[in-house]
């Protein structure tokens, strides 16, 4: 099937010759593929296992929309041309592409394990050792450090786009897949970038349609780290970002929800990557060097987060004490007996049980945390001076660079000047609806890969951060974000006739015309 779209109109592509462009869709013969079972499905199509000259491969069959929609064709062409030029142990290996009966297919190496989302869900986040969590985090950061060095911006980093390959007994390797939203980024045309990605991991500047750069991948990586630390369910429900807080991550709440056995430096890294200001986020080069230091040390020697002070959520007026063992045990008993469970407990029972297991085992015999110590790991922020050791406060005093917010400790005091921005008006029905919607248990496997058809809003980040929520609640248009409905007010009720007369200055409302009596016409016809 011939393609009618012009490749010259597509930006963000690597440079190539005409001969290479013609071979993009015919680098292998479909008849050489022996298709097997389906192993995955997404908004762009389905993925099947196949055999290619005796080697197991994964075949991504793209949707038929690629042939008729120029946007889908653009994403497909970028994925092929970018993926075939990548060579990294933590990036899925590209094999070729072909077209069969009008359907385009991308063939890559086959990874036996599932994605990271399934990996966490099947095992339970508390059953994954901190050694493995930091190892997977290092693999992902290594891949993205390589991508950014090649001027590639990914724009859809999430757990479902990370495959976990079991390479040995208890040994795993993370690999990045699905380059459908990736593009070449030279840092010049930041205002022309399309808004795309998954709503749960998109950075604030991408959500509001502002200009962005490769630091949006760092923010998504920070959200992914919080999933490795707290669990996917906690990030999706209790740490859900909404327009009422300018899509900012509540890092103070995340600190309290994290298990006390989490290495202090690992938690600080996640908070640092989730900095609201893109300029405050680290580069992946810095992240890789820091994680290398952490993974090369014994976990028992690493300081852990420890117990957190009780926390009151200002948005929900709820008291959170994740380190109270008695509360966690009570939640576990209520879970087993199915007695006196509220909607909040129903959402978080599994996560509370996991947290209680970690809280009761601070030292963790399997090596998933060390003794609580007064020292803490300091992450350096100087790119030129890379990580070569972990610095402890009792051995050396580190001077942080100015204007760097380590995990957002000062964010709540500095980034919002209008206190009413976070405080809704009294008896606000929209806020009640927002709380109720956040209490609804959402399906973790819900597909989040839809391509937004339009900008979510024309407002910039500063417009949203410094404006009253009512002013942008009516402006924002979020067809792919489910919290837009919580901000919308109920439709007004129709006015009564007396009210209409009052509004119109005493003019009575127009009466509807009476329908003609068709029965008389029928009788006349009979006569």
From Swiss-Prot:
GO terms for cellular component: autophagosome; cytoplasm; cytosol; phagophore assembly site; phagophore assembly site membrane. Keywords: ATP-binding, Kinase, Nucleotide-binding, Serine/threonine-protein kinase, Transferase. The active site is at 156 (proton acceptor). Residues 325-359 have a biased composition (Low complexity). PROSITE patterns: PROTEIN_KINASE_ATP, PROTEIN_KINASE_DOM. It comes from the Eukaryota. This is Probable serine/threonine-protein kinase DDB_G0271538. It comes from Dictyostelium discoideum. The lineage of its organism: Eukaryota, Amoebozoa, Evosea, Eumycetozoa, Dictyostelia.
